[in-house]
């Protein structure tokens, strides 16, 4: 009789150990896969870098780098010209 009882208990031991392992997995629901996250981030960075290089090399972005640089006094000269032009215009008669 004791032999049968020991045999039945030995059959139950793996199920008890398996249920304990499952409980440990259930206790820790947040398991992060950092390797996949790192690879995904690197792929995303490479795609953005490639798109940036292709955009620069395709010259579809029409930037205004070809404009002549203005001299420091040009803006002041334009304002003075407008002031003198307004001063020399004949004043309109008010009705």
From Swiss-Prot:
Family assignment from sequence similarity: Belongs to the FXYD family.
Location in or out of the cell: Cell membrane
Ranges per topology, Extracellular: 19-35
Pfam families, sorted: ATP1G1_PLM_MAT8 (PF02038)
Subunit and partners: Regulatory subunit of the sodium/potassium-transporting ATPase which is composed of a catalytic alpha subunit, a non-catalytic beta subunit and an additional regulatory subunit. The regulatory subunit, a member of the FXYD protein family, modulates the enzymatic activity in a tissue- and isoform-specific way by changing affinities of the Na+/K+-ATPase toward Na(+), K(+) or ATP.
Protein name from the UniProt record: FXYD domain-containing ion transport regulator 6
Signal sequence bounds: 1-18
UniProt-listed PANTHER family: FXYD DOMAIN-CONTAINING ION TRANSPORT REGULATOR 6-RELATED, SODIUM/POTASSIUM-TRANSPORTING ATPASE SUBUNIT GAMMA
Residue stretches spanning the membrane: 36-58
GO terms for MF: sodium channel regulator activity
Taxonomic placement: Eukaryota, Metazoa, Chordata, Craniata, Vertebrata
Keywords for this protein: Cell membrane, Ion transport, Membrane, Potassium, Potassium transport, Signal, Sodium, Sodium transport, Sodium/potassium transport, Transmembrane, Transmembrane helix, Transport
GO cellular component, one term: presynaptic membrane
GO biological process: potassium ion transport; regulation of monoatomic ion transport; sodium ion transport
InterPro entries: FXYD_motif, Ion-transport_regulator_FXYD
Protein's membrane topology: Single-pass type I membrane protein
Function: Associates with and regulates the activity of the sodium/potassium-transporting ATPase (NKA) which catalyzes the hydrolysis of ATP coupled with the exchange of Na(+) and K(+) ions across the plasma membrane. Reduces the apparent affinity for intracellular Na(+) with no change in the apparent affinity for extracellular K(+). In addition to modulating NKA kinetics, may also function as a regulator of NKA localization to the plasma membrane.
Primary residence: membrane
Gene: FXYD6
Species of origin: Pongo abelii (Sumatran orangutan)
Topological domain ranges for the Cytoplasmic compartment: 59-95
PROSITE patterns, per the entry: FXYD
